[in-house]
């Protein structure tokens, strides 16, 4: 998914990253005695996470509906994982990505979450439980969320091989990433990951400069070329890392890459200007380019997508009223408004049934069912992003999520990867 704080803005909303708690508004909540519920309204929860979901609009709506104040702080993925581990008393709720759970949860800073307290647990998509959205779908290589979703018990730090009553995070958001292209400038159909390094696009392609994600895009490209076959792209051996980095360095020396971007806005600017015609990209960045009236496609590719997901965890130190408020917040989060809000940006929500109730049939048809828009599609800030008759790139939910080939990961050789990636960066 992300890095760099301004770099993590994978969304179109102006002023979307939350910097502070929201104090206005209130609303009734249910499920607690009156006095208890009134006390919960006085609770402030400190949450940190990436810019994908650390959004003022979510905190504001939560305050309006539940009375709970959420103080949000946005940061990049690596900083979020580091804070979770090294400053466990500085937050109450951790909004982190699943691939970082391999680092964070064994540090004993988050508490296993009781699924019996999650109102919509049974409605959470199976991707986070069994790993498959359909019986025939593959789970994909790397740190698929289901591999780190559960622990063996209430006090356990050991990941469970199958669903238990204790989750590491309650899932909230996920997506399938691919290459972004300028169809008006590439001059031919784009069908494969190997097109990223086609000499025809020399000096006009770009790759994300985040080791854990860029290496995946490179691996998808090399397998597409037929020059490498990985045992597990999400957990490479040192020789596999060496070969992948050597490939990237050679392509860099050949002048293939125009840029190595870290931020959402960088990727938008590169594509909007036409400096780059094919690159690693995020769905809302494609939307941002389109909102300028410029053709841009989030291109489905034959080899599949790279997946990522995130969720909410509760700090180990949280107890009593504050912990109950955190569970209430999570239950509110899954109740539909937030899911619809995220879906409208091109992400997917963990509980589809409640999100659907907060979307129009036209919105649901466009974003989820792969149907042509019957009216203009607008983002949460009102920007028109699709016209009547337009289709979402990649088709339906099942077409996209069912074709994830690998997931963002923390490799066993992560430190070695970062070292080698730095060699590529300065080459």
How would you label these PLM feature ranges?
Residues 1-11, 34:
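N-terminal secretory signal peptides
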Residues 7-25:
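N-terminal export leaders
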Residues 37, 315-393:
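Mature extracytoplasmic/periplasmic domains
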Residues 38-107:
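Early extracytoplasmic/lumenal segment of secretory-pathway proteins
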Residues 53, 105, 110-266:
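Extracytoplasmic ligand-binding site segments that recognize negatively charged/polar headgroups
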Residues 87-95, 109, 201-203, 273-278:
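Alpha-to-beta junction loops
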Residues 256-319, 356-359, 363:
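Extracytoplasmic/periplasmic substrate-binding proteins
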Residues 383-427:
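Conserved C-terminal helix/tail region of periplasmic/extracytoplasmic solute-binding proteins
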């Amino acid at each position: 998914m992300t890095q760099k704080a301004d770099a993590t803005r994978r969304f179109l909303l102006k002023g979307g990253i939350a910097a502070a708690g929201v104090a206005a508004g209130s609303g009734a909540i249910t499920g607690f005695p009156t006095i208890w519920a009134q006390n919960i309204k006085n609770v402030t929860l400190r949450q940190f996470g990436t810019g994908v979901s650390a959004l003022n609009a979510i905190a504001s709506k939560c305050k309006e509906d539940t009375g709970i104040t959420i103080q949000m702080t946005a940061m990049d993925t690596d900083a979020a994982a580091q804070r979770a581990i090294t400053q466990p008393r500085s937050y109450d709720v951790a909004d982190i990505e699943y691939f970082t759970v391999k680092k964070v949860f064994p540090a004993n800073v988050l508490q296993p979450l009781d699924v019996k307290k999650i109102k919509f647990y049974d409605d959470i998509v199976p991707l986070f439980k069994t790993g498959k959205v359909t019986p025939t779908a593959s789970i994909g290589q790397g740190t698929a969320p289901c591999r780190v979703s559960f622990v063996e018990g209430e006090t356990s730090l050991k990941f469970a091989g199958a669903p238990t009553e204790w989750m590491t995070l309650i899932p909230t958001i996920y997506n399938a990433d691919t290459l972004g292209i300028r169809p008006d400038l590439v001059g031919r159909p784009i069908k494969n990951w190997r097109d990223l390094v086609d000499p025809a696009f020399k000096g006009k392609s770009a790759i994300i400069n985040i080791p854990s994600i860029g290496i995946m895009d490179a691996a998808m490209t090399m397998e597409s070329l037929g020059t490498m076959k990985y045992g597990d792209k999400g957990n490479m051996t040192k020789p596999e890392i060496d070969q992948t980095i050597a490939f990237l360095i050679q392509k860099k020396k050949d002048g293939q890459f125009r840029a190595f971007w870290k931020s959402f806005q960088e990727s938008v600017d590169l594509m909007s200007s036409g400096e780059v015609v094919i690159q690693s990209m995020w769905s809302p960045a494609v939307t941002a380019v389109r909102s300028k009236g410029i053709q841009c496609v989030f291109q489905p590719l034959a080899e599949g997508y790279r997946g990522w997901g995130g969720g909410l965890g509760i700090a180990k130190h949280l107890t009593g009223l504050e912990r109950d408020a955190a569970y209430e917040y999570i239950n509110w989060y899954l109740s539909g408004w937030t899911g619809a809000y995220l879906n409208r940006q091109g992400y997917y929500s963990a509980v589809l049934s409640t999100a659907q109730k907060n979307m129009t049939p036209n919105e649901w048809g466009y974003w989820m069912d792969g149907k042509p828009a019957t009216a203009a599609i607008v983002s949460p800030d009102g920007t028109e992003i699709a016209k009547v008759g337009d289709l979402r790139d990649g088709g339906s939910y099942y077409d996209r999520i069912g074709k994830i080939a690998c997931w963002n990961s923390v490799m066993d050789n992560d430190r070695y990867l970062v070292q080698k990636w730095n060699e590529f960066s300065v080459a």
